[in-house]
Amino acid sequence: MPPPKPVHSLRGPNKMLENFQCRSCAACSGELILDLGEQPLANNLLAPEDLAQPEPRFPLRLAVCTECWLLQITDLVPPVELFSNYIYFSSYSDAWTQHAAECAARYRDEFAPNYVIEIASNDGYLLRHFAEANTPHLGIEPAENIATVAREKGIKTRTDFFTEKLAQELAAEKPADLILANNVFAHAPDINDFVAGLKTLLAPEGRAILEFPHAVEMIAQDEFDTIYHEHVFYFTLTALEPVFARHALRVTRAERTPM
C-alpha cells in the first residue's frame, strides 16, 4: 500500500520545516500542516484572581514526518506542566464510564488476565471493574490529586509517569499479562520509550490494548479542536506499525470505537 500523499492546508502547499526531527523514526524531513500560533494550555483553567494576569502561551503547530507519516506537534510543553495536577476526572462522563465497564467485561471474558496494569489510570474508572472481580491490578497515574481519589476507591495506584525505567522496576516484581492505556499514548512525548516500556512490562504472552483518537477521522471530520498541547501525536496504523516493530511488538487487531 503506497504511503498517503502529503496533506495541504487551506493556505496552499505545506512548508518544509527546518530543525525538525521525527520523534518516532528520527528523520529530519517534516512538513508543516497547521500553524495555530501561540495558544494557552487547554485545561489550564484560571482562578478569578488570575484573570487579569497574562496567561502563558505556547506554540501550537502540527507537522507530518514525510518518512514514516507520523503526525505530531512540533513544540513540547513539559509533561509535568500538563499532568501533575490534572483537572479531568474520567468518572465525570457517564458515556465514558459505561464504555469502560463494557471494555472491562469484554477483556475479562476474552483474556482472563491474572494481572492488569493501566497506564494513566485516572480515578480508577476502568480498574475498579477488575478490582471488583478480585483481579490483581495496578494503576499508574501521574496526577497525585487524581491518584488519591483512586486509592480512596480501593484501586491500587502508583503516582508516576510511565517510562521504560519504571517498566523495568515493575516487571522485576511481576510482569503484566494485560496492559491498558486509554487516551494516553498520544500524550507521551517519547514514543519509543513508551513502547519499549510496554515490551519490557508485558509477560511473554501478554497483550497491550491502546485506545486513542484516529488521525484519519480527525482529518475527515475537520476535528481541529482535538489539536492541543496534550496531544503530541495523531496516529494512523501506517505510522504506528513501524514503531511497534522497532521494539519487537506487532499489531494483532485494530478496531474503531464510536464515541
Where do the language-model regions lie?
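N-terminal juxtadomain amphipathic helix
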Residues: 12-95, 255-257
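Short, glycine-/aromatic-enriched active-site segment of Class I SAM-dependent methyltransferases
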Residues: 44, 210-233, 237-238
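Conserved class I S-adenosyl-L-methionine
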Residues: 112-122
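Conserved SAM-binding loop of SAM-dependent methyltransferases across substrates and taxa
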Residues: 123-134
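Conserved SAM-binding motif I beta-strand of class I
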Residues: 136-141
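Conserved SAM-binding strand-loop segment of SAM-dependent methyltransferases
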Residues: 154-167
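A conserved beta-strand element that flanks and buttresses the S-adenosyl-L-methionine
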Residues: 180
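A short glycine-rich, Lys/Arg-flanked "PGG" loop and its adjoining helix->strand segment in the class I
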Residues: 192-207
